[in-house]
Amino acid sequence: MSNKMWGGRFTERPDEIMEDINVSIDVDRHLYAQDIAASKAHAAMLAAQGIITSGDAKNMARGLDTILSEITKGSFEFKRALEDIHMNVESRLSELIGPAAGRLHTARSRNDQVATDFRLFVRDEIDDIDAALAAYQQALATRALEFAGTVMPGFTHLQTAQPVTFGHHLLAYVEMAGRDRGRFADARERLNESPLGAAALAGTSFPIDRHATAQALGFDRPMANSLDAVSDRDFVLETLSAASICAVHLSRFAEEIVIWTSPLVGLIKLSDKFTTGSSIMPQKRNPDAAELVRAKTGRVIGALNGLLIVMKGLPLAYQKDMQEDKQGAMEAFAALSLAIRAMTGMALDLVPDEARMKAAAGEGYATATDLADWLVRTLKMPFREAHHVTGRIVALASKQGVALHELPLEAMQEVEPKITADVLGVLSVEASVKSRTSFGGTAPKNVASQAKAWLKRLEKQRK
């Protein structure tokens, strides 16, 4: 006869391989706080509804608090033979309060229990990630204000395109992080419904109060369909989708840090705090923190893809496949949280080489668009014609091996005789960025204003 809690109709013990593949405690032990909170809410509701006595409910609550303390202190013994976090907690509760512990599972299944636990866990992860992203935004916006007027090259195709400011570049990532936070908030809102009380799949005949347990656990409402409550994991998928997009944003900035710290580029420097050395080349300072952030993006995206594949062919309701929903997600959330903290640290640590940035901003004829705009504005030339004229002037400067602002006025007039000396006032990188005053543009005044607005917004969110 099986000694499992589900073993009443079984006459043989599970094979050892079955034990190994079925056990999940190594992963779902991380749900202990959520499992205990949900059990306390369930016990209180059962007592309020007259399904169990108030004395039993109080004993359950005291026992569950003891278990929480034991796990927190590291003295709790997790047993693989008990399969999962639910049975480990229930078994220990039986040791603490006796047979009354068996009444805790009244009107409840492990199906709605784990769905509730995991929703609570993901909700907690969202809140932690949001706080980390807010700190990341704070760091970026602070540095953006500091470097609102620091000119650097803006790139397209990784080629010098137009001058921008370093502060403007940093604010781009503040905006991305803001949208990331919005996606996590949206996922949290849809997540925040309680599966508890759905039981195995069809609900229960006991007169439970699902609204009471939902409220006790901070959910907005109970889920309206018991089949849906136990059989879907879209709340994890949606959160992993938000996490994947966020990780991609972090990875893009990390990639830029890797490029910019290269001696061949030299736009920024990281201190020893966020670099490592080589075991054989003593001169090396490697941007390993940024490289690892870039790599961890694959772990996050992989978790999303993995769970999508697990869920794609599952009929309703619960299937054991869904036991594989947690490990990848937990690892992904941990990886993302670490990546956010690492990027926050690097954002505060990095030091731009302002002279190198300014010099690089002028390379590659980056103010050519300013010349074309001058032709349109001053000579009333159609932009397409101005684009062509500017291209010829750039080709002439390239042939002579000089920067655009170094090309003699007479040489420009060979291409377009109407050009006057006034054009020289728009060809410096400083003039270029100062002229970009359109909303969202890179003009230093714009950047400072946007950075201050973000810092004010973040301060308001903290209150």
From Swiss-Prot:
The highest taxon in the source lineage is Bacteria
The alphabetized UniProt keywords are:
Amino-acid biosynthesis, Arginine biosynthesis, Cytoplasm, Lyase
Catalysed reactions, semicolon-separated: 2-(N(omega)-L-arginino)succinate = fumarate + L-arginine
Molecular function per GO: argininosuccinate lyase activity
- Its GO biological process terms? arginine biosynthetic process via ornithine; L-arginine biosynthetic process
- Give the EC number: 4.3.2.1
Pfam families with a match to the protein in the record: ASL_C2 (PF14698), Lyase_1 (PF00206)
Mention any one GO cellular component term assigned to this protein in its UniProt record.
Answer: cytosol
Q: Where in the cell is it found?
A: Cytoplasm
Family to which this protein belongs = Belongs to the lyase 1 family. Argininosuccinate lyase subfamily.
Q: What is this protein called?
A: Argininosuccinate lyase
Supply the source organism for this entry. Answer: Bradyrhizobium sp. (strain ORS 278)
Its ancestry begins with:
Bacteria, Pseudomonadati, Pseudomonadota, Alphaproteobacteria, Hyphomicrobiales
